[in-house]
Amino acid sequence: MNSWDAGLAGLLVGTMGVSLLSNALVLLCLLHSADIRRQAPALFTLNLTCGNLLCTVVNMPLTLAGVVAQRQPAGDRLCRLAAFLDTFLAANSMLSMAALSIDRWVAVVFPLSYRAKMRLRDAALMVAYTWLHALTFPAAALALSWLGFHQLYASCTLCSRRPDERLRFAVFTGAFHALSFLLSFVVLCCTYLKVLKVARFHCKRIDVITMQTLVLLVDLHPSVRERCLEEQKRRRQRATKKISTFIGTFLVCFAPYVITRLVELFSTVPIGSHWGVLSKCLAYSKAASDPFVYSLLRHQYRKSCKEILNRLLHRRSIHSSGLTGDSHSQNILPVSE
């Protein structure tokens, strides 16, 4: 194993560690907070988090073993199962992000009727469709024997070793990425751009009111006026940064892998194995970044994390004080009469 392979193996280990801890923390927050569970987005987050954890404990270790051993890391049956999960979880992750963007669009564009339009039952139906959509392609690939170990990505994933099936497999792979990656990307762009448009409209209204107030308050201290103007600027940039993060992480993580898969099918130029594994690692890194992008940086999840931490510290302090009291009572000698 050369330095490139060692670096890729280290990247995979780091991604696995961050993904496991962060997604487990999201699950703890969902279990702890009833307020979060009552909201419709909690179902999308739960679906995304469970998929990320499954990918972390099944697919990432097999890819790590493939990088280290430079060969198929498991038997054919286990590899086909891992390839089925890899295809399903990738599509499920993309479609779950599209569902979350639709939820944000409904919340921002229809704030007064959001609870009526996006109930837990509606969210459950969307998750059910996501699963059905994501299961279609790996089920078809399993029936056509297009699941196995792919040396270029050191992973158990979609692959076809028969030259006579090259065209059919290329059409299938193109359709899979069009109806998972491209469809989700279009939904993300349409919904978040609409959200950005509404957010900018509200910012302009707030800015007009703020400027009118500043004009009326002639005796206002210059430092207060400057802070108000700086807050205006931050308000304009906040929505843009969030939406850029949502779409940017989706593209950075998934686009290199999808493009590599398509170039591999339709180009005669050989692709380096290190780039293939790196693009797969980038796709895996979405499982590590999702908890921070969609959950842990939000106020409700931060509050839930603090409550969990305080409860653990409180239990530890009670336990330690109990042990101290027991040891102190044991050290006291009985006084004879």
Curated annotation (Swiss-Prot):
Ranges annotated as spanning the membrane: 11-31, 48-68, 82-102, 124-144, 169-189, 246-266, 277-297
GO biological process, one term: adenylate cyclase-activating G protein-coupled receptor signaling pathway
Recorded consequence of changing residue 236 to A/Q: No effect on constitutive activity
Effect listed in the UniProt record for changing residue 236 to E: No effect on constitutive activity. No effect on constitutive activity
Membrane topology: Multi-pass membrane protein
Cellular component terms (Gene Ontology): plasma membrane
Extracellular side: 1-10, 69-81, 145-168, 267-276
Predominant localisation class: membrane
Cytoplasmic side: 32-47, 103-123, 190-245, 298-337
Protein name: G-protein coupled receptor 26
Gene name per UniProt: GPR26
